[in-house]
């Protein structure tokens, strides 16, 4: 049977946050737009609807499960505030059912949005036939040949499995954990990325024994002092860590558990049995199986797409989101994989293509948060990178430990939460990095990101009167510098 054919002004390959934003914005400018999106099942068979990683297996479910863990912590604290609380019991199935129900409502909403914006949606896997044409195949095998004047590739990425026996047969990834129909039980999380630590945090937080196996450092690419604080807090709250280790095999046991063998840096070996083995060792971009060579688009050695203002080496083909090679940007950036970045880049690209606008995506000074049990919010440079770029003599770091008021009655730890500003001395102590570990770190960081984006200096922070008692006010009170050697520990709540 001959393939159906269709012609569009813009074809978007990938229905994640960036692709959807770009397609709807282009349609609002009167263009004929189509989106192709198709989810190949994970090795355990998990699949999902329209919306990409963030909605289905990323930001949304992980934040909801992080909240589940925080609620459990809050119930423990409640007695200190006078509440008589029976021993709380968590129901994994209820949580997963409600989370998946919410995700499905979002999937439906995205499909409705495309329809109401006049965007044609193909639930089909697209591969290039030539620079202007793709072949889209749906789950029933129906083939549609689609041509477009411009094409945007935003196919995202998928979790990587280690190349060891039993990994794909017996392990899961973040593609699967949010839809697990039964509790994870004793869980081994392999990796120390933000995905690894976030998953380990909420699994432990809702009541399951959790171990993290890490090869080297936690939260690579983030400020390492802050990463250490996140890790220490997790250890103090019951998450075990196997450090300097790499898994070598996963085997099924007669009891139904998974036996994981590993090798340590000193050459010694070890093993343990777990009910769930979750791999979070990184992600691979989805560019290898879309016929991108037939489009003439060049790839970096890591499979990502080098771009200039989202444009590839083929003038009418663009890329946004995870697949952009952030290291090839000028300056390099690690923010290309963030959902809000993809959304912003997609909208701005559509405006440049079809509305005569000129605004470009700025990948610098983008705020982010790691939803570990002790949340970590950041905007700007890690301390190590600031020193590397500008020299230690040109950097001033203001810092302080603090204890949220809410932690006082339950007698939570002192000098656990921490805030620091990284300032560039030759530019009037312009703030080039802000980092905080503490409750609601994301909510706090978002507001400060606006100020830092606008060029705020340490003097601006000092001149701002804080809201008392809040966690955020710590940034208006910072006085001790690392250079001075003065103590950053706090003994009271009034500066």
From Swiss-Prot:
One of its GO terms (biological process) is cell redox homeostasis. Disulfide bonds join 54-59. Gene3D superfamilies: 3.30.390.30, FAD/NAD(P)-binding domain. Binds 1 FAD per subunit. Pfam families: Pyr_redox_2, Pyr_redox_dim. The N-terminus is blocked. Its EC number is 1.8.1.9. Activity was very low in selenium-depleted cells, but increased 4-fold to the same level as in selenium-sufficient cells for 70 hours after the addition of 10 nm selenite. FAD binds at residues 37-54. GO terms for cellular component: cytosol; mitochondrion. There is a cross-link at residues 493-494 (Cysteinyl-selenocysteine (Cys-Sec)). InterPro entries: FAD/NAD-bd_sf (IPR036188), FAD/NAD-binding_dom (IPR023753), FAD/NAD-linked_Rdtase_dimer_sf (IPR016156), GSHR/TRXR-like (IPR046952), Pyr_nuc-diS_OxRdtase (IPR001100), Pyr_nucl-diS_OxRdtase_dimer (IPR004099), Pyr_OxRdtase_I_AS (IPR012999), Thioredoxin/glutathione_Rdtase (IPR006338). Its cofactor is FAD. It catalyses: [thioredoxin]-dithiol + NADP(+) = [thioredoxin]-disulfide + NADPH + H(+). It is an enzyme of class 1 (oxidoreductase). The active site is at 468 (proton acceptor). Keywords: Disulfide bond, FAD, Flavoprotein, NADP, Oxidoreductase, Redox-active center, Selenium, Selenocysteine. Belongs to the class-I pyridine nucleotide-disulfide oxidoreductase family. Homodimer. PANTHER family: GLUTATHIONE REDUCTASE, THIOREDOXIN-DISULFIDE REDUCTASE. NCBIfam families: TGR (TIGR01438). This is Thioredoxin reductase SEP1. It comes from Emiliania huxleyi.
